[in-house]
Amino acid sequence: MTYPQAALIVIDVQNDFCPGGALAVTGGDEIVRPINDLMAEFGAVVLTQDWHPADHSSFADNHAGSEPYSLVDMAYGPQVLWPRHCVQNSAGADFHPDLNQGAADLIIRKGFRASIDSYSAFFENDSQIGRAHV
């Protein structure tokens, strides 16, 4: 079945979220082949890419005395502090090497503002700042 008027949105299939990465998801690399297979079924393919500056406010090591997975209050609400991951231009921020990047019609980078995290391809965590760079 094909979906010519629909988009496949592929979220953060990056080295740091795969086994061996800084914020690895067990078996995260096992989804790459099925994603590649699905790409041909959709009219558009969008990839998102976590893309943090080194001084990102969500990194635990940027908060003296804080541990990964602890909570801090930010201007936009509670924020989980993460291990350093997906730093701009690092191997961890690269897409998984087997992901078919050539099939992407659009790549959306998120989390690139140092003072605010972003879990969405559409809005920053403050729900007020939309995507400025695609």
Model-derived features with residue positions:
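Catalytic P-loop NTPase motifs of RecA-like helicase/translocase cores
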Residues: 17-18, 114
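Residue-level marker for buried hydrophobic side chains located in beta-strands
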Residues: 8-9, 47
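Active-site alpha/beta core segments
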Residues: 33-131
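Short glycine-enriched, charge-decorated loop/helix-capping segments at active-site entrances
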Residues: 19-28, 121-125
